[in-house]
Amino acid sequence: MKVRSRPRIVVIYNRDFEGAEADPENKAREDVKDVAQDVLRILGASGFETGELGVTNDIPEALSALVAMKPNAVFNLCESIHGDNRFESLMPLLMDLSNIAYTGSCPFGLSLALRKEKVKDILLGSGVPVARGGLVTCVGDCARLEIAFPAIVKPAREDASVGICSASVIHNQTALEQRVAYVLETYRQPALVEEFIEGREIYASILESVDGEPTVFPFFEIDFSDMPSDRPNIVSFEGKWVEDSIEYKGTRPVRCEGLSTELRACIAKTALNAFRAVGLRDYGRIDFRLSPAGVPYAIDVNPNCDLSDLAGGYSRAAKAAGLSYKELILRIVTLALTRHERASTIALHPAAAAVSADVPGAVILQREVEASAPRGGAGSA
């Protein structure tokens, strides 16, 4: 059997930001292509063979093309199909069936994370605090909710802050019913209604090692000090994606300071519990609202958080932990390669050696890759 001298990594990403299915909230999908190009550049410069596949709505064609490329692993950036992120798990499922290794969470974790009401139940059962609330499928359901105002209303099956704006935070029953009606009609899915937790918004980013041990990066939080007083302190869609908006300027990510050692440990432990409970893999981020009483309430579980270099909160946290963007991408690729049954036939060392030895964390990455290689050498069958 001929052993490939260099692993081939194919980067896949969704192309549903193009054409008729594009929508006004398209920015959240369109940025994925820029991330794909950054990843391809890093992998190519690090000694990997690379391939690129933009996934369209023709899934059989996409799978056939991917199989023909014979990747040793896939860097998965395919976050939606047909403009619908409910199909985020489809390509990972097909790759599992085709015995193709890929980065990130498995179909179960990806699908579950989009069922926000189910995630709340699982988190609650795992001892992770969540805001009181419920799923609403019609306006009439609002009357049965046992919540206190203010509350927040958001689409139950979206991510990337899609469907969240200043009007999402409501203060009375009439506003609740109006906002629920808007979500049901606009997004054609149930609405999730939760008590709004006043307090700091803190992000805990997590990265696994090749032995499966997760590490929590330094926390970041949102600085709302420049948010106008007539707007709620939330990260809306505009706050996340529209750079010239008031919300964007009022939601500045900063290092999380001023937490006691005990509270930091509590948030880290809670984040790891949430990561495991929802079935995330390789990397992810848990978002919290810290109540005035010091309770970290999990408000979102992100299996496919933004991996962009400059604007991405996840890469920002990795850099705070001493990992360069290049190291982060190589670490994630290594996780996929070492997980696959064919990893013993792949020469992993050149890619690891491409990481500069004077960059913090490079030695750790090298050791992880070496530990994953078979005793007889990286090229043994």
Model-derived features: where do they sit?
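Phosphate-binding site of ATP-dependent enzymes
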Residues: 173-269, 292-297
